[in-house]
Amino acid sequence: MGEAWELSVEPDFPSRIVDGPTLDEVLRADPALLGKEAPLGSTALLVKLIDAADDLSVQIHPSDTDPALAAEESGKPEAWYIIGAEPGSGLYLGFRDGVSRQDIEMAIDREGAVDALMSFVPVSPGDLFLIEPGTPHAIGKGVLLLEPQRVSPGKRGITYRYWDWNRRYDATGRLDPGGKARAIHRERALSVTSWDGPRGDALLERVRHRAGPAAKDGTASLETLVGDCAPIGSEVFFLQRLAGSGDLALPADDRLRSLTVLDGGVTLHDGDTVLELARGQTAALPACLGPLRVELDVAHAMLCTLA
């Protein structure tokens, strides 16, 4: 599995300005960069790129209001935007209808197949999912995605591991049938699961939007995928997709934003200041920026903002 933390203020994996200090140091030194987030001291936005070469472990995140969280811990709501997917690949999202807590306990304790008790969702480029607290989930082999998350500044986003495909590893972390299993957070995972929430098709209707592949060969466009008046509403994220070739105007915003280029090229124009971005690069757009002229070159990019 390949994982890149594109925009992060977490102490263990901080983003760093090119040839400069960490992003967290820059934001804490100038509250104007944060806009609405200034009272927090830094940003709660965390953006990752994940390329799953194998099935990832089944995980779950608690809500921010979970009473079991320590003072230094935070919930971690997230979204998944599918960039690429091999034929037959997909996600595991929630338990299937009729699966009980006792069924999951037995599967874990007997080293059974927890994946057989989950809803498998085939995916295509352009699919977008909101992963709500209390929803068991896993990224399947062959999926490449962008993952924006919200983690309270100065705190550690919490993930509980439900199941890891009964794999074992040697001391270096390589697969080894004679090695040790990774830690499973059985009781905590079970306790934060939304057992009475929607499952299957009912869950997908609430959390999935199939936007289709980005129109890289068309004229420049800016499409809101998550947010007000968008296909999916969210109290956490505001997500937009840029695609095509040509110029477009990006309005000012009073929030810090993350722009990640997924394909092609993107050039940002702020008066006489020009910033060129290539595939795989991410720019943090401060809240104090005015309107920008964005030049797209057969581009596909995602703009991530906290609501």
What are these regions (language model features)?
Residues 52-55, 73-107, 142, 244-271:
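Glycine- and acidic-residue-biased ligand/ion/polar-headgroup-sensing regions
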Residues 64, 84-132:
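Intrinsically disordered, low-complexity linker/loop segments enriched in Gly/Pro
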Residues 205-252, 257, 263-264:
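Basic, glycine-rich polyanion-binding accessory segments appended to enzymes
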Residues 51-55, 64, 74, 85-88, ...:
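Ligand-binding loop in jelly-roll beta-barrel domains
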Residues 111-167:
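Loop-centered beta-sheet repeat module
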Residues 118-130, 271-289:
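Short acidic-glycine-tyrosine-enriched beta hairpin
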Residues 1-100, 164-216, 239:
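Transition-metal
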